[in-house]
């Protein structure tokens, strides 16, 4: 994108990660960070939908969760080129779009478990995939500003689909971002060290992870207080 701006093929005013630009994580700022209780997540996991649109949204949610809470924009950009055969097996390897230009950013390596492979196979067999994209988020061969606008539209649409799914299952405000929050809290609940959680989330420093997880603590203590 920087090169495109330099060559005047794109405008710096709409640079996706610059001031005033496209920030998919904040397209629709959530007033409250939400994560699912274990039983709510299990309900989503075990509730396949006959409606294809809702089933696609459900599986995208699960894919994000099992890929260490991968953000929607990174899910959207995954291609065959992100699948790498390493010594210990196949991995999805990528850098977060949000921090890829940071010197501290490192590639995230996600082992392709049987669950992830099953999800990828389902998308390949049941949805039209564009070009080399792994998932049915980007549906047209767009580039530059058109691509970011397209992802913005798809982000809103899939979140609407998830909210419909949530209403069916009795889960409020289900969105793609909830999968990331849920993954982080599930790991913390299993006493995974925050250093590891920080690494799999692609945070460039532990302070970001601490702030991120600490933001949930009030919600947790509030719920505990209601039990007394």
Predicted region positions:
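Conserved tyrosine-mediated DNA breakage-rejoining catalytic core shared by Y-recombinases
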Residues: 77-121
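N-terminal DNA-binding recognition helix of tyrosine site-specific recombinases/integrases
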Residues: 1-17
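Basic, Lys/Arg- and aromatic-enriched nucleic-acid-binding interface segment
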Residues: 15-30, 34-72, 76
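Active-site/catalytic core of tyrosine-dependent DNA strand-transfer enzymes
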Residues: 41, 113-171
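Short, contiguous acidic/charged loop-to-helix segments that flank catalytic cores in large enzymes
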Residues: 49-51, 97-111, 145-154, 172-175
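Short, basic (Lys/Arg/His-rich) helix/loop patches that form interaction surfaces
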Residues: 150, 159-199
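Catalytic-site neighborhood detector that most strongly recognizes the C-terminal catalytic loop/helix
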Residues: 27, 35, 98-100, 201-226
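Short, polar N-cap/turn motifs at the start of nucleic acid-interacting alpha helices
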Residues: 82-90, 171-173, 192-211
């Amino acid at each position: 994108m920087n090169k495109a701006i330099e060559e005047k093929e794109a405008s710096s005013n709409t640079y996706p990660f610059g001031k005033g630009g496209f920030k998919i994580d904040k397209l629709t700022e959530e007033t409250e960070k939400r994560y699912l209780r274990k039983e709510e997540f299990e309900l989503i996991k075990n509730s396949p939908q006959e409606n294809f649109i809702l089933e696609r949204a459900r599986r995208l949610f699960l894919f994000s969760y099992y890929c260490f809470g991968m953000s929607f924009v990174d899910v959207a950009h995954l291609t065959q080129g992100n699948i790498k055969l390493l010594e210990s097996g196949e991995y999805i390897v990528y850098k977060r779009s949000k921090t890829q230009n940071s010197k501290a950013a490192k590639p995230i390596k996600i082992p392709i478990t049987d669950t992830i492979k099953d999800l990828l196979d389902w998308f390949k067999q049941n949805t039209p995939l564009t070009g080399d994209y792994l998932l049915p988020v980007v549906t047209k061969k767009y580039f530059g500003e058109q691509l970011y606008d397209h992802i913005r539209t798809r982000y809103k649409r899939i979140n609407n689909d998830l909210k419909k799914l949530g209403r069916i299952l009795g889960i409020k405000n289900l969105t793609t971002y909830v999968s990331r929050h849920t993954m982080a809290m599930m790991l913390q609940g299993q006493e995974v060290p925050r250093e590891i959680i920080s690494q799999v989330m692609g945070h460039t420093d532990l302070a970001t992870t601490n702030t991120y997880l600490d933001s949930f603590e009030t919600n947790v203590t509030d719920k505990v207080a209601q039990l007394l």
